[in-house]
Amino acid sequence: MEKTTLLPGKPNVGNLFSFFAKKKAGLMGKFVPGWTDNKIDALLFTPKTADIKPVRLPRGIDQFVIKTRDGEIQAYQTGKGPTVVFVHGWGGGAHQFFPLMRGLAQCGFTALSFDHLGHGLSDKMPATLQQSIATTNHVLHTVQNSEDGLCAMIGHSTGCITIANARPALVKDRPLFLISPIFNYKLYVLKKLVKLNLHADQVKQYANSFTNTYRSEYQKFELARTLARYGDYTLIAHDESDSESTVADSEQFCARYPLTRLLITKNTDHVRIINSETVWQELKSHLNYDDTTVNFTAKVIYQ
């Protein structure tokens, strides 16, 4: 009997392209392993920028450029007084902090946030952890030498790692407020790797390669190692339902370093926690600001 194959109508061109692209990557990975690793590096550490639109500035927030050794970054500032610097995580942006910044401005602080290289309207390039640390050092140093001076730092996600790995002279004895911190950077990267939907062989090859690179280049940056020296003036805010980073990691750290305060929220997930009322109240307290007359809202008011 003649064998037949049932074809489901017209072939899907997109699927065919994906099929051949993965085949090509698989073959290239066998003959030139570094090629695959470089391509995956680009996918992992270069945020998508095709849909980025100019930021619509909220009322009272100024936008300007900071020139660093590696490129130009977009910065945003409001208020007058001691400066609180906000540091976003991978894939985030300065805009995430606008409501908190507006609130701090009403409390007599200068609030400054910036887009890391590769993010927002800053220069486009791979956004590695080392690059983020270098940029943060530049910003903190600039603020420290400004008229208002550096008062405190607020980080979110991998931005918490960035702050803890900044130059100690810039961080020591200043209040740190860390939101949804990533305590396991290796696991964080491997989770991102899986989400790329690559061929299993490519994932395995890159995971093995990254594990070796992690030991030599990234392990020293892990938050539990570097935050310990600042634990007595750090407050961590973490949501119990956070799917990006488990709250158990924050609980474990605070159990080991009991002077570190821990705020656990409910139903605000990894991102919405930033501009929650609970975080706002704890932030004021952490900065020793007790005036309860300042109203806070997560709603952004534009020009």
Residue ranges and their predicted role:
Residues 2-65:
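An N-terminal hydrophobic leader/cap segment in hydrolases
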Residues 94, 101-123:
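Conserved alpha/beta-hydrolase
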Residues 100, 223, 232, 246-255:
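Short alpha-helix in the alpha/beta-hydrolase fold that links the catalytic acid
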Residues 126-145:
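Alpha/beta-hydrolase active-site loop
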Residues 154-163:
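Gly/Ala-rich beta-loop-alpha elbow adjacent to hydrolase catalytic centers
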Residues 168-213:
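Hydrolase active-site cap/lid region
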Residues 230-231, 236-238, 242:
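Short beta-strand/loop motif that positions the catalytic acidic residue
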